[in-house]
């Protein structure tokens, strides 16, 4: 796909204009599905093998694992299924995990260790474990030369300003913030060189194939957090 491509630029909306040779977090995703045996939770609990217990043990083991992971590791999860009624021992439960770190090799080893946590949960509860690998992405490989060119052009082209209606809208949005950022920051370009973003992106995979750099532009009200309703309100 990128064989004839000299360079790749990627863009992301933001509350600020920014460019630089910034990296990201590598990530692996996995779903642990446990299958046990249903039973009446009060009438015959000894007959049940709780898939939810297996999820809870997996999560507890993962919490203990955090203490013994390298700096900048991020492990987070959601329980997708945990039973339907408290009077029934859950025969099926599922938990979804993300593992992140600035180094993809570290992520792979953390994934191995997290699978051991799930295996322990299944062993302790006599349930069956299915490991559903959901994919992985590498960290962005920074390219300083491209980043400098992008930042220079972004500064030359940046001529943002708010009209009266836009200013009034921005001020209303900022009333919902705990910390306000001057609206004049839309005229600035932040240098992100040498930093590591807290997110993960498949652009990371691309960056290991072809020279890649990225930038963001001020599409939201200054001070807006990503993945928030304020970001959506900005359109």
Task: Outline where the language-model segments fall.
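Poly-acidic low-complexity segments
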Residues: 1, 50, 143, 202-205, ...
């Amino acid at each position: 796909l990128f064989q004839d491509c000299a360079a790749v630029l990627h863009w992301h909306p933001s509350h600020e204009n920014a460019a630089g040779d910034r990296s990201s977090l590598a990530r692996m995703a996995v779903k642990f599905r446990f299958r046990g045996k249903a039973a009446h939770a009060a009438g015959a609990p000894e007959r049940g093998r709780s898939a939810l217990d297996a999820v809870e043990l997996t999560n507890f083991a993962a919490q203990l694992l955090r203490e013994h992971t390298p700096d900048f590791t991020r492990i987070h999860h959601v329980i997708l299924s945990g039973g339907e009624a408290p009077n029934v021992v859950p025969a099926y439960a599922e938990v979804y995990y993300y593992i992140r770190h600035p180094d993809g090799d570290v992520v792979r080893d953390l994934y191995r260790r997290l699978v051991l946590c799930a295996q322990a949960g299944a062993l302790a509860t006599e349930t069956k474990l299915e490991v559903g690998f959901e994919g992985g992405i590498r960290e962005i490989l920074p390219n300083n030369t491209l980043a400098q060119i992008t930042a220079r052009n972004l500064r030359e082209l940046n001529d943002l300003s708010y009209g009266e209606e836009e200013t009034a809208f921005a001020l209303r949005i900022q009333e919902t913030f705990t910390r306000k950022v001057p609206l004049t920051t839309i005229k600035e370009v932040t240098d992100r060189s040498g930093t590591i973003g807290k997110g993960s992106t498949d652009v990371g995979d691309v960056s290991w194939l072809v020279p890649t750099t990225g930038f963001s532009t001020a599409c939201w009200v200054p001070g807006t957090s990503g993945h928030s309703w304020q970001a959506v309100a900005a359109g």
